Amino acid sequence: MSYQEAWNPVDSSLDEIISIAASLKSKTGAVKEIFSQELTQREANVKKVHENLEELQKKLDHTSFAHKEDRDRLEAQIAQKEQEQKAKLAEYDQKVQNEFDARERAEREREAARGDAAAEKQRLASLLKDLEDDASGYNRLRPSKPMLSEEDTNILRQLFLSSAVSGSGKFSFQDLKQVLAKYADTIPEGPLKKLFVMVENDTKGRMSYITLVAVANDLAALVADFRKIDTNSNGTLSRKEFREHFVRLGFDKKSVQDALFRYADEDESDDVGFSEYVHLGLCLLVLRILYAFADFDKSGQLSKEEVQKVLEDAHIPESARKKFEHQFSVVDVDDSKSLSYQEFVMLVLLMFHDD
């Protein structure tokens, strides 16, 4: 076998190997291309995934921010509701406290009213007792028994219950004048006003039903007394009739009787008419009330200081007060430095003489 013949199979194998190698190289390039494309695609996919993740993170961040705003808004609403609820609770507590305070005030006012009513009842009882008591050596101006009839008392009670008293439960000065007009056509307003101020029960110028009945009874008594004293029924009182009446009332000193007559005889006619008598009676009733209030120890005597104090409280004119020292010594004939009711009346008459 020649060399060529022996080499041919080898060449054929080499060609086949070269062909296979070329084929492998071609396939390797294709595989590499495929791998390169897959790698590129994978990188693109990874990039896309990253982009998606970033987008998702942005969405998550936005959602978290939105949730925070919602949470803050919700917390603010809750805080506002809590404040409103606290305010309502505080308002309710204040309302309850105000109602409680109002009830306490009302209870205190009721207690005070009950105390005032009891004190007023005691004051009136003491006053009426003083007016009726003859233990000090003088009598009151009115008779011992009530002068108001049952019908008159019912009229006063109806007036008290009616709206004519302005719903206050007490009488004004005009109410008093209206009631007393039943007993006399003309009642001097000056002394009546003084009497009203002395016995009014509050600072608003009103008197209670009990006080009105007492005052009306006194006025009715004055009318009845005048008719009884006027023995000849001529409508006036002579000096003799006047003096005899006041002796019965305990004014036994002639000087006092004469002073009373001069005071009552305003027109200097030497007799005392009905209106003059009522005027005097009202003035004496005012003085009797002043004296009774000042005589705290019920001794029937007022010291000089007590007399001066009661006259100051009565707001007498300055011109009359200037006469006090001199006239007190004139009236206090026994130099006891105190005055009985009769001497007290005489003192006032002298102080107001020519005023």
Curated annotation (Swiss-Prot):
Residues annotated to bind Ca(2+) 1: D230, N232, N234, T236, E241
Sequence positions that bind Ca(2+) 3: D295, D297, S299, Q301, E306
Pfam families (UniProt xref): EF-hand_5
Binding site for Ca(2+) 2: D265, D267, S269, D271, E276
InterPro entries, per the entry: EF-hand-dom_pair (IPR011992), EF_Hand_1_Ca_BS (IPR018247), EF_hand_dom (IPR002048)
Domain EF-hand, first and last residues per copy: 151-186, 217-252, 282-317, 319-354
Residues annotated for Ca(2+) 4 binding in this entry: D332, D334, S336, S338, E343
One Gene Ontology molecular-function label: calcium ion binding
Keywords, comma-separated and alphabetical: Calcium, Metal-binding, Repeat
Record SUPFAM superfamilies: EF-hand (SSF47473)
PROSITE patterns associated with the record: EF_HAND_1, EF_HAND_2
Note: This protein has four EF-hand homolog domains inferred to bind calcium.
PANTHER family, A to Z: PROTEIN PHOSPATASE 3 REGULATORY SUBUNIT B ALPHA ISOFORM TYPE 1 (PTHR45942)
UniProt-recorded name of the protein: Plasmodial-specific protein LAV1-2
Record organism: Physarum polycephalum
